[in-house]
A protein has these predicted regions:
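A SIS-like phosphosugar-recognition module
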Residues: 1-168
Length: 168
């Protein structure tokens, strides 16, 4: 249902001048969502299915979702999907804020860190400063033996990128 909520919002934002071409945003998002849905469908074998592989790898852990910029809301939504659909506790944080306090918690987590899996929402066009923060954060927390995964936004436009990460 989430994509359907965005379409009227895109049209409205175009009418008030916040975006230039709502049709292009929506069209690309639909195409990307079809591709992502097909490649992650229940009929797609696990070795070719990102969603299934991710689910198998994070099973039995508490998912921690990290986002930035446009993916801040996506991180929160994924956390809510874990809670609602998978019936597991989860948490989310966002860059750059998470680098202030979150890292200290991981440095002191010890064996408890093994109970968590960290999902970084990434983007090929992410700002260099964010890329550096993500890579540094991955280095710091990988010392704690946690499972680390990346979910990369697909497409060129913001709507497609955001929705492609939500539907995994």
């Amino acid at each position: 249902t989430l994509p359907y909520l965005f379409i009227p919002l895109c049209v409205l934002m175009e009418k008030i001048g916040l975006i230039e071409d709502a049709r292009a945003e929506i069209s690309e998002a639909i195409n990307i969502l079809k591709r992502v849905s097909d490649s992650n469908s229940p009929n797609t074998p696990s070795n070719d299915n990102f969603s299934k592989k991710l689910a198998l790898n994070i099973c039995g852990t508490v998912p921690v979702v990290y986002g930035f910029g446009i993916y801040r809301a996506v991180a929160q939504r994924l956390k809510q999907q874990f809670n609602e659909n998978s019936k597991v506790p989860a948490k989310w944080e966002f860059f750059p804020e998470l680098n202030h306090n979150e890292i200290v918690g991981w440095e002191r987590a010890g064996e408890l860190a093994r109970c968590f899996s960290v999902l970084f929402i990434r983007d090929d066009d992410e700002p260099e400063v964010i890329r550096q923060r993500i890579e540094t954060t991955k280095e710091l927390i990988s010392k704690e033996s946690m499972e680390i995964f990346e979910i990369c936004g697909q497409g060129r436009r913001r709507l497609a990128k955001m929705l492609s990460t939500v539907v995994i």
